[in-house]
Amino acid sequence: MGTPFKMERGVKYRDAAKTSIIPVKNIDPNQELLKKPEWMKIKLPANSAKIDSIKNGMRRHGLHSVCEEASCPNLHECFNHGTATFMILGAICTRRCPFCDVAHGKPLPPDPEEPRKLAETIQDMKLRYVVITSVDRDDLPDRGAGHFAECVKEIRQLNPNIKIEILVPDFRGRIEQALDKLKDNPPDVFNHNLENVPRLYREIRPGADYQWSLKLLKDFKAMFPHIPTKSGLMVGLGETNEEILQVMQDLRDHGVTMLTLGQYLQPSRHHLPVARYVPPAEFDEFRDKAQAMGFEHAACGPFVRSSYHADLQAKGEIVK
């Protein structure tokens, strides 16, 4: 028998090193991929002074953006717009979802200075709306909830007029403890992504539980009825439209009023392949049905991501 694979703490495992240890091994890096349709082709602009400024500001304070770590296709647009989604608690995730480009591994302990550095960076950037997300930290007793709370507290102390959206993991097995940590420093928008349909969870979200994620959204809403709750979904992973509509209804049944729906894009050949490219007209239909279900805001489009133009979503403007 060969030597068992042993991860080193603080090392980022990506692509084949990451997806080789998922429970459902159905990724063939040599398989023929679907050709991107014209509506999925975007022209990336050359790096601008605004993009360089945001990147340099993050590097200077030792911070991370999910825009870079997850290889988001909207990075250039958002950075040029002067917005970014900050990723706290390091850049190594304890989960190994095969749709995601964030590195897997054994993360380092949280940086106790990160909340202060984050608040100072946001102040320097003169942001009015900020999204804070994180990797999964199943290694921490509170799954990182206390660190989220400290970040919100520090940001508000230096930026009293800012609006804060947090995009949180599922706090596996620690929902009650996590919400207790957040109760004194709640955000302006609480976001937790269901990602896709429950039938595909074992394949695409190993370690997650669909009902647990719904419970997190419902329990937060019960604790803070005045704060909007939000969730995001990807399409193109093998789900049916009927399954997506059922997930949307489940979200409404659990008090969620904001929805994002976008096309899944394969980060590399070592990730799950795209099963289908959904035409823009179908996204328009999803948005119409979301509004009919009672969602107050529904951003639906091929390039929509959970934090894409989150400031405009929060204002109720149409994003697609």
Swiss-Prot record:
The keyword Transferase applies. One of its GO terms (cellular component) is cytoplasm. Its main location: cytoplasm. [4Fe-4S] cluster 2 binds at residues 93, 97, 100. Keywords: 4Fe-4S, Cytoplasm, Iron, Iron-sulfur, Metal-binding, S-adenosyl-L-methionine, Transferase. SMART domains: Elp3 (SM00729). It is found in: Cytoplasm. GO terms for molecular function: 4 iron, 4 sulfur cluster binding; lipoate synthase activity; metal ion binding. Pathway: Protein modification; protein lipoylation via endogenous pathway; protein N(6)-(lipoyl)lysine from octanoyl-[acyl-carrier-protein]: step 2/2. Its EC number is 2.8.1.8. InterPro entries: Aldolase_TIM, Elp3/MiaA/NifB-like_rSAM, LIAS_N, Lipoyl_synth, rSAM. It comes from the Bacteria. This is Lipoyl synthase. It comes from Pasteurella multocida (strain Pm70). The lineage of its organism: Bacteria, Pseudomonadati, Pseudomonadota, Gammaproteobacteria, Pasteurellales.
